[in-house]
């Protein structure tokens, strides 16, 4: 299990070895909603900060934000990233020891954090998509997701006959008309809303059962539900499913 942020002993700060800025904070802000404090696996409870980008996943959605700063790869506990954001001061420097990292602010104060030793899984294959062709998300899409979510017992929104629906059976469902959506896919509404700020352009890929989304400096992938499964979808059970391929 992951060690709690408050249980880790902290020594003196790591010496500055690089100049950084608030692009790191923008990256944390974009991907942090996907990390989960106390998750069983470190890669689900942390942000991967690396050269050029930051990555986080909850096992169902993965997002990568490009900050453009050259840094060594490190797995930062979510609580540490939250503390850096809450500090409310501009970032100016970075220190690193391999097992810890220090984030320096403009007034020479700092936040030092231990790093998880685990490796973040290879996520690049998740973005493979033949014929990728993202298009602007329909203007009413997230209004529809919110509207339908309140009527969905499973927390899933379905794409049926040019509409978002709360149930696979249209005669029993609440619906919201949205043109241009692929037929037959279904997504967890909570996960869609988590990435709404980054969900500006999207490619819904029926063959891989994923949606590939893009925003300003960010890309991501969201798994659709398996509608061919004989087991009914259970939102609470799937909250703890960390088998996000290939994780």
Question: Where does each model-flagged region fall?
Answer:
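DNA polymerase processivity clamps
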Residues: 1-247
């Amino acid at each position: 299990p992951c060690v709690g942020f408050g249980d880790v002993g902290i020594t003196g700060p790591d010496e500055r070895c690089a100049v950084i800025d608030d692009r790191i904070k923008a990256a944390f802000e974009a991907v942090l909603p996907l990390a989960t404090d106390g998750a069983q696996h470190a890669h689900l409870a942390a942000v991967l900060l690396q050269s050029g980008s930051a990555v986080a996943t909850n096992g169902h959605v993965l997002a990568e934000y490009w900050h453009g700063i050259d840094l060594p790869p490190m797995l930062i506990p979510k609580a540490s990233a939250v503390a850096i954001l809450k500090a409310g001061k501009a970032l100016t420097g970075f220190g690193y020891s391999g097992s810890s990292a220090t984030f320096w602010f403009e007034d020479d104060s700092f936040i030092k954090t231990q790093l998880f030793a685990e490796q973040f899984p290879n996520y690049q294959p998740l973005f493979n998509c033949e014929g990728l062709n993202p298009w602007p998300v329909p203007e009413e899409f997230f209004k529809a997701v919110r509207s339908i979510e309140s009527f969905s017992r499973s927390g899933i929104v379905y794409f049926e006959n040019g509409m978002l629906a709360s149930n696979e059976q249209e005669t029993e469902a609440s619906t919201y008309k949205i043109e241009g959506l692929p037929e037959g896919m279904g997504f967890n509404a909570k996960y869609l809303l988590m990435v709404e700020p980054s969900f500006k352009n999207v490619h819904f890929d029926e063959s891989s059962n994923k949606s590939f989304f893009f925003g300003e400096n960010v890309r991501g992938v969201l798994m659709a539900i398996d509608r061919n499964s004989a087991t009914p979808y259970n939102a609470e059970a799937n909250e703890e499913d960390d088998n996000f391929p290939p994780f």
